[in-house]
Every structure is written in C-alpha cells, then in structure tokens.
UniProtKB/Swiss-Prot annotation:
UniProt entry tagged with the keyword Ion transport: no
Pathway: Metabolic intermediate biosynthesis; chorismate biosynthesis; chorismate from D-erythrose 4-phosphate and phosphoenolpyruvate: step 7/7
Upper lineage: Bacteria, Bacillati, Bacillota, Bacilli, Lactobacillales
Gene that encodes it: aroC
Similarity field: Belongs to the chorismate synthase family.
GO molecular function ontology, one term from the record: FMN binding
Gene Ontology, cellular component aspect: cytosol
Function: This reaction introduces a second double bond into the aromatic ring system.
The protein's name: Chorismate synthase
Amino acid sequence: MRYLTAGESHGQALTAIIEGIPAGLALSAELINKELKRRQGGYGRGARMRIESDRVHISSGVRHGKTTGAPITLTIQNKDHQKWLDIMAVEAVEEQIKFKRKITRPRPGHADLVGGIKYRFDDLRNALERSSARETAMRVAVGAIAKAVLTELGIETANHVLVFGGIEVAVPEAMPFTDIKKAAEASDLSIVNPKQEATIKAHIDQVKKEGDTLGGIIETIIYGLPAGLGSYVQWDRKLDAKIAQTVLSINAFKGVEFGMGFDMGYQKGSQVMDDIIWHETSGYSRRTNRLGGFEAGMTTGQPIVVKGVMKPIPTLYKPLMSVDTETHEPYKATVERSDPTALPAAGVVMENVVATVITKEILEQFPSDNMTDLKQAFFAYRDYVHHF
C-alpha cells in the first residue's frame, strides 16, 4: 500500500491516489465522510471549519460499493477556493493580482521562511499553502480506508487527549479500551474525564481572548493486533519506528513515545519490562504493557499505545516579530486565520495516520490481492500465534 497527496490550502481541491488496497473491501464515500467530520469537530475550532464541510469524491478503484484492487482516487473540494480564484490561479495573471496577497513577512514556527529559502520563492505563500494542516484532511480520508481494512480483521483504533494546554487529564487506572473509545468520542475535547471539561474549555476561551494558542499530548491506541508484526532484522523494518516517523509528519507534532515513553529514563529495568505470562486458553500475554505493545520493533500482542506531543499552533493573533524578506526590516509576522487549539482534530489525524501504517504493514506481511485471501491468511496467523 502506498499513496500520495496533492493540493494547497486555498487551492481547488485536495487529491490522493492510493495503491494496494485489496479487492473486495466494502467502501463508500459516506464511510470516509464520517471520518472527515470527526476531524472538523472539537472545541476551539475556528472559522475555516464553518466554511468547509469536507466531503470526498471517489473517482476510481471502487465499483458497486467494493474496491477493485485498482488505484483509488480521492478528491476533496476546497469550498473556500471561490474567494481565492485569482490569487491561486493556475494560469499566469496580471502583476497587480499576483501581488494582491503576497507574503513577505514569514510567521515563526511555520514553513514560510525556510520553504521560501529552499525553493527560491519571492512570495512565501507558495510554502504556506502546501505546508498547511489542511493537507491532513486527505490523510484522514486515506486513513478511513485503512481503518475499514482493520475493521474487517477485528482491529480497533481510538485516540484521546492526555494533556490539554498544560492541564493533565485524570484517566482512571486500567480503564478498558472500549470505555476510552466511547468516552473520548462523546467529548468535544476528546478527553475521557467529563468532570474536567468545564475547566479546560474556560482555559481555551481565555487563551483565545489573549490571542494565543495551546498544545498538548495525544494518545492513540490500536487494539486487537497479534504478536509479530514488524521485524527486528533491519532497522527500517521496525514497526514502532515507522509509526514514530508518521506521527512526527503531522503538522505541529514535535515528539513521540510508546508506553511509558520518556518516563523509562527515570526507572530501573525491573520497573519497565513486561513480564511474560501464558495461559492454556489465551496463550502468551504480558502482565503489563509498559513498552506500549512493542519489543524489538515488533508487536507483542498487547495494545499499541503511542503518544504524540503537539506544539501550540504557531499562527498567533498577537503575532511574534519577524523580518520582511524584501526589506529585511523587522515587522510583526503575517496573521492568517487560525484556531486557539486543534488538539481534538489532531487526535483524529494521528489515529488515522497510525492506522494507515498498521494497515500497510499487514498488507505487506500477508497475501492481500483480495480481502478473502487477506482475512484467511491473517486469521490463520492469529490462530497460530494463539497456539504457539
């Protein structure tokens, strides 16, 4: 499985071509749209979410509600593009139009300046448009297809916010996966403790009044995987490393950890490793899951628990100082439309990109030309692991 995305924040549309999805997978635009709607929700979202109501168009690779095994083409139209027809025109335009929304004052924390340097842009909008988090809408659409494959294999996914703008969410100890998923999806903050919602929302509102933004820590959980996905034989085949790369590819994500993560640096080995246990009916398992479902780059059969830290959104309504790239004089950075926080949406993105990596690994490890062969091979392997 592989895919490419294309499109700009204020361009005509976002596009993706996905190759390697097995034939025979039940798939509809509505299934993908439900996932896109999740991304657009959450407390603290701004005007863009009222403008855009993302709906995907499938133009290839699906016939009569089932995938054909051919490349799948997805398109999401940008409704906001109507206000940017001249500025984002593909064809050459007159000079006065070309410079109408020209950006020469890069925003700290964005791709504006470094992208302009790398690609020799005199208008930094070219970097801004492609590097925008708008692109993650298409990665969620791709993830929705990946999650459809996982569902057929009995694998579930969930995400929730652990730290919201410096406020730690009190997660009940040993909270079951199903309860985490249900509570987070019922919360417009994607937290599992409803008693903290009022406090966090008041914090978001205050930060918005101050013209500032908030970051936090998100946890994604993958439940139902057998032991043995991934490999230790080469560095680039370690599955946890692949997940780490894809999490860090999400806009504004600056760190990733598994299980206890960086807390392991403060512990002894006996406080970190997961005891191996065996039962005649359930086979091998672990007494704990401190390593987050991985040993030596391979799944252990425990839930995958991965955390990502998202920096505060760098677009501020009280902009930081910058330098004009034409005059080299100091100025306040350009202000583009932004939200005080996007943590709930970022959690949906993280869940979907991790699901995509897991699906890709499964499709590489098992026969995957069609769903019948995939399911037969996957369930046979799961049975083998169970009786090892």
